[in-house]
């Protein structure tokens, strides 16, 4: 096989041993990704009720029963951006559930770093949160105290401690089946620093995915392991259709598609047999050419335990290499034939009971269903605009920042407040599911020229941007763009409260100052937009530490929320 020679530091591994078998050996790999602490069902797929981790566990057990030689793996974002029932307890419930589901390996994803490096290490090794009394609730729910930590292995091949050069977690893990082993290399996307808070990962370095994988191949093969599987928290976007979760577009590697994983796979050593991915909002089951043009399987389940990938691999008895692979994405459908795993049901309901008083607290009244679905033309959503409006309202007063507009990242909107809540009260739990991060708000001063430049960088080809990523904007601020114009020159109109800032692509007053509110993720160079770096010297930001739900509350009782009217952005006619 083709080998790519790269220097590699000695990296630790995890090893699991299973009973000895003979002849060609079939092994079942049970894979999922982007669980995000969804202990209960996150909704439907094509109008079919799916998920709930106790139902998911029943599917895993059913697949396990088909073959005693099995392994369960996750391709990242197991925790982070979680509903209240998990995140209120710092995702300890999710780790405890996965221990009981008998997960073997989890490759870190970007959301594993949401609460910083030390908290992620606590997820692996256990112990109570140093500050929050909501941690270590085992006595009330029937789990060990202090928090037991993960009994499965986190993997982080491309995440290094900058001081020591060691990986944060083992680069790969192995599981033995008779005389042979399968190696699982686990890693997150190299771009993780651009989508998590920098403060929590300042001691870490994130390396190129393909280079990291290829550098490990000689070490793994020197151990006599030929079967190599990659668990990577990186994928891609493709046009989605309702209920499509087990297919792949013929032109999956087309330059017209945003498919970062295709670029990574195209560089992989031919020793890699299978790539299990995460990070994308859709499921796929593909075969993508590697560095020598051989098509290798690349899979992605749908998040929130709604789809599980059932993979059968055949190990050659002589070489130990994978000689055959079959794959199938299975919908985790709720129906009468599926009996949820009782112990897991009991555990998640115990945590739900603890969270219920807070989750049920009414903080507002629905005046319309609010969704996070982005308009394909202007990139805006009802939910994103409403959050931006709330952030502007919280920081408009001179005492709280003097903001004139607010910008919100669409990736920070994690759930809908759908028709099932309308008409009716909005609860803390519903708001928390929509905005689970607990970010702070920061208001800073920019010139009109700086703001225009930030907006230009939302579009592909401007200063290395690979895909369109549009910020959600507050009411009163609008702009128009022409995507056919040259890179970094696409903003043709920009206005604030009826006052023109840009007309015909030209700034009217480049030095005009504006007070802009964003969350601290965006301010901390999130999305690779230089909002913090460009804040004017001598104009410090005003920080307000609050969850979005607090912005919507008042002492008089439930607040009527008016949903912004779309569009606030549009392509020019």
Show the residue positions of the predicted features:
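Short boundary motifs at domain starts and secondary-structure transition points
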Residues: 19-21, 173-176, 505-508
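Acidic, metal/ion-coordinating pockets
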Residues: 23-334, 382-393, 406, 462, ...
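Gram-negative bacterial Sec-dependent N-terminal signal peptides
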Residues: 2-22
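Catalytic centers of hydrolytic enzymes
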Residues: 25-28, 37-46, 50-65, 95, ...
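Serine/threonine-rich low-complexity intrinsically disordered regions
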Residues: 1, 240, 253-254, 260, ...
């Amino acid at each position: 096989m083709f080998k790519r020679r790269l220097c590699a530091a000695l990296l630790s591994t995890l090893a699991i041993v299973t009973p000895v078998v003979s002849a060609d050996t079939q092994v079942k790999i049970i894979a999922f990704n982007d669980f995000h602490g969804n202990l209960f069902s996150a909704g439907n797929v094509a109008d079919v009720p799916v998920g709930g981790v106790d139902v998911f566990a029943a599917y895993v057990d059913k697949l396990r029963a088909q073959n005693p030689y099995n392994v369960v793996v996750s391709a990242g974002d197991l925790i982070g951006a979680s509903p209240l029932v998990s995140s209120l307890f710092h995702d300890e419930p999710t780790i405890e559930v996965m221990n009981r589901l008998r997960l073997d390996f989890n490759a870190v994803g970007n959301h594993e770093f949401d609460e910083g490096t030390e908290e992620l290490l606590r997820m692996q090794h256990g112990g109570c949160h140093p500050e929050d009394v909501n941690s270590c609730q085992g006595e009330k729910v029937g789990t060990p105290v202090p928090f037991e930590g993960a009994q499965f292995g986190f993997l982080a091949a491309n995440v290094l401690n900058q001081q020591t050069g060691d990986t944060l977690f083992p680069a790969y893990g192995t599981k033995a089946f008779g005389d042979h082993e399968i190696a699982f290399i686990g890693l997150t996307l190299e771009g993780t620093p651009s989508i998590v808070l920098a403060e929590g990962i300042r001691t870490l370095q994130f390396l190129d995915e393909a280079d990291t994988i290829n550098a490990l191949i000689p070490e793994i093969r020197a151990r006599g392991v030929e079967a190599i599987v990659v668990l990577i928290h990186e994928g891609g976007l493709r046009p989605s259709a309702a209920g499509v979760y087990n297919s792949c577009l013929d032109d999956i590697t087309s330059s017209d598609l945003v498919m970062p994983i295709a670029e990574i796979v195209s560089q992989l050593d031919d020793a890699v047999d299978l790539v299990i991915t995460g990070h994308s909002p859709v499921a796929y089951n593909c075969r993508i050419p590697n560095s020598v043009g051989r098509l290798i399987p690349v899979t992605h389940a749908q998040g929130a335990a709604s789809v599980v990938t059932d993979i059968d691999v055949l190990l050659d008895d002589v070489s130990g290499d994978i000689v055959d692979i079959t794959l199938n994405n299975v919908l985790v459908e709720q129906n009468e034939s599926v009996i949820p795993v009782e112990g897991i049901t009991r555990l998640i309901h115990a945590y739900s009971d603890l969270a219920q008083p807070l989750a049920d607290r009414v903080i507002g009244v629905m005046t319309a269903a609010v969704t996070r679905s982005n308009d394909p033309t202007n990139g805006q959503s009802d939910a994103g605009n409403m959050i931006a409006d709330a952030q502007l309202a919280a920081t408009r007063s001179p005492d709280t920042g003097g903001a004139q507009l607010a910008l919100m990242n669409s990736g920070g909107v994690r759930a809908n407040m759908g028709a099932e809540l309308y008409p009716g009260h909005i609860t803390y739990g519903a708001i928390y599911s929509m905005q689970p991060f607990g970010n702070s708000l920061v208001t800073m001063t920019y010139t009109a020229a700086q703001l225009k430049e930030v907006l230009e960088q939302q579009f592909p080809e401007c200063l290395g941007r690979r895909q369109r990523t549009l910020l959600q904007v507050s009411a009163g601020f609008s702009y128009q763009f022409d995507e056919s114009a040259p890179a970094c020159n696409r903003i043709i109109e920009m206005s604030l409260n009826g006052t023109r800032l840009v007309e015909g692509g030209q700034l009217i007053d480049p030095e005009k100052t504006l007070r802009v509110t964003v969350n601290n993720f965006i301010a901390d160079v999130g999305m690779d937009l230089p909002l913090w770096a460009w804040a004017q010297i001598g104009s410090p930001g005003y920080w307000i530490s609050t969850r979005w739900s607090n912005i919507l509350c008042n002492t008089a009782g439930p607040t009527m929320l008016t949903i912004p009217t779309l569009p606030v952005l549009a392509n020019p006619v």
